[in-house]
């Protein structure tokens, strides 16, 4: 199947400035992400950036780059600009991989594209089971709840569903004894959409729920569209948000 991967690579980061160019095993981080996307079988891989040094690095390893505005409020807005500039057809499948995911498994890149095509929805994504109590209660871990067919009911930074009886019985002091049931899933921030849907998405105004949760995918649910979720065939390792994350990834790739 044909699909295009777009990798937003924003240079300015409050926690780790310049991270697309951070050296990992002798290559800039963005090159690792690009290589994983290439290995997925994508028809085309484009890096979208607002910083010339990142663009120069991408050209240096023969990657395709699209310069974008630095004024975007979200990665989805950056995707929409790329689609317009490159005249990508409305029915083209677009997979969005974040530029700070140098360990993303290529198999899940193709999986999310196939998920979109299989279920004939405008947007698809992936999740993995939560098996750790600390992860469950971590607001930086986005939880996703679906119906019986895998269509999203809600995304939240809070614990969903809330196991009332078990939580009340254990109390905060005994959460280590919590029995995690099969309905707890961590959302993986990789998406597939039709190009035309991305153009539609950016026409919608930000919604109350997405502003409260700081999760832009809630705009899709608010406007009555469906998102399908599959369990990822392979759980991705850590992304790079902090210096500590960067050191973990460097350690992993130094042994590859």
From Swiss-Prot:
InterPro entries given in the database record: Cytidylyl_trans, KdsB, Nucleotide-diphossugar_trans
Any one cellular-component term (Gene Ontology): cytosol
Q: Which family does it belong to?
A: Belongs to the KdsB family.
Keyword flag Transferase: yes
What the protein does comes down to:
Activates KDO (a required 8-carbon sugar) for incorporation into bacterial lipopolysaccharide in Gram-negative bacteria.
A Gene Ontology biological process noted in the UniProt record is: CMP-keto-3-deoxy-D-manno-octulosonic acid biosynthetic process
The Enzyme Commission number assigned here is 2.7.7.38
Q: Which reaction does it catalyse?
A: 3-deoxy-alpha-D-manno-oct-2-ulosonate + CTP = CMP-3-deoxy-beta-D-manno-octulosonate + diphosphate
Instruction: Identify the gene encoding this protein.
Output: kdsB
Cellular compartment(s): Cytoplasm
Q: Which pathway is it part of?
A: Nucleotide-sugar biosynthesis; CMP-3-deoxy-D-manno-octulosonate biosynthesis; CMP-3-deoxy-D-manno-octulosonate from 3-deoxy-D-manno-octulosonate and CTP: step 1/1; Bacterial outer membrane biogenesis; lipopolysaccharide biosynthesis
Identify the stretch annotated as signal peptide in this record.
Answer: none
Give a GO molecular function annotation for the protein. Answer: 3-deoxy-manno-octulosonate cytidylyltransferase activity
List the keywords (alphabetical).
Answer: Cytoplasm, Lipopolysaccharide biosynthesis, Nucleotidyltransferase, Transferase
Q: What is this protein called?
A: 3-deoxy-manno-octulosonate cytidylyltransferase
């Amino acid at each position: 199947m044909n699909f295009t991967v777009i990798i937003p690579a924003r240079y300015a980061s409050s926690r780790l400035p310049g991270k697309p160019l951070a050296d990992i095993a002798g290559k800039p981080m963005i090159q690792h992400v690009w290589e994983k996307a290439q290995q997925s079988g994508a028809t085309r891989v484009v890096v979208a950036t607002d910083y010339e040094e990142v663009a120069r690095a991408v050209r240096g390893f023969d990657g395709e780059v699209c310069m974008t505005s630095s004024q975007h409020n979200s990665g989805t807005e950056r995707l929409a600009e790329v689609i317009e500039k490159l005249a990508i057809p409305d029915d083209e499948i677009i997979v969005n991989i974040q530029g700070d995911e140098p360990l993303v498994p290529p198999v899940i890149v193709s999986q999310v594209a196939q998920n979109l095509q299989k279920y004939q929805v405008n947007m698809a994504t992936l999740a993995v089971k939560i098996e750790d109590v600390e992860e469950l209660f971590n607001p930086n871990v986005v939880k996703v709840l679906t119906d019986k067919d895998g269509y999203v009911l809600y995304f939240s930074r809070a614990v969903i569903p809330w196991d009332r009886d078990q939580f009340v019985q254990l109390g905060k002091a005994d959460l280590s004894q919590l029995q995690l049931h099969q309905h707890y899933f961590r959302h993986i921030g990789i998406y597939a959409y039709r190009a035309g849907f991305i153009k539609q998405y950016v026409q919608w105004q930000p919604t109350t729920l997405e502003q409260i949760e700081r999760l832009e995918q809630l705009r899709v649910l608010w406007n009555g569209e469906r998102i399908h979720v599959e369990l990822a065939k392979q759980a991705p390792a850590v992304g790079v948000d902090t210096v500590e994350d960067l050191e973990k990834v460097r350690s992993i790739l130094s042994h590859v």
